[in-house]
Amino acid sequence: MNELEAAHYRWEEIPKEPLKPDLARRLISSERMMLAQVFLEKGCVVPTHSHENEQLTYILEGALRFWLGEDESVVDVAAGEVLHIPSNLPHKAEALETTLDVDIFCPPRQDWLDGSDTYLRSSATR
């Protein structure tokens, strides 16, 4: 895509990528940022991980509990709320309810694009 060309997307036209039985996503990515719809069933755990990408998580429906940093500070984020996760901050999440969130990453998550995000595809809860 030429950097001077706009792009228009419809979420329903983007295939939902199942990662495990209780977790799926849809991705839109550009050169400098990524937008993801993330679908989590109640009880779904995203294991502790970190990445160089800055992250914003906006909860549209449901609620997530995050454990942040080495001290695992707990933050609950509900519908209508946004969590900013700085680059390289270890974090883990659990769906307190069936949840739909939108994640924004800068730069794009290369591991999500190339499928090397094995921490997310595993059933282990670390």
What are these regions (language model features)?
Residues 60-61, 78-79, 97:
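A cytosolic small-molecule/anion-sensing beta-strand core signal
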Residues 39-41, 51-66:
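Short, conserved beta-strand element in jelly-roll/cupin
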Residues 87-111:
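Ligand-binding loop in jelly-roll beta-barrel domains
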Residues 21, 34-50:
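Conserved short histidine dyad/triad with adjacent acidic residue
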Residues 1-32, 36, 118-126:
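A short, N-terminal "cap"/entry segment at the start of jelly-roll beta-barrel domains
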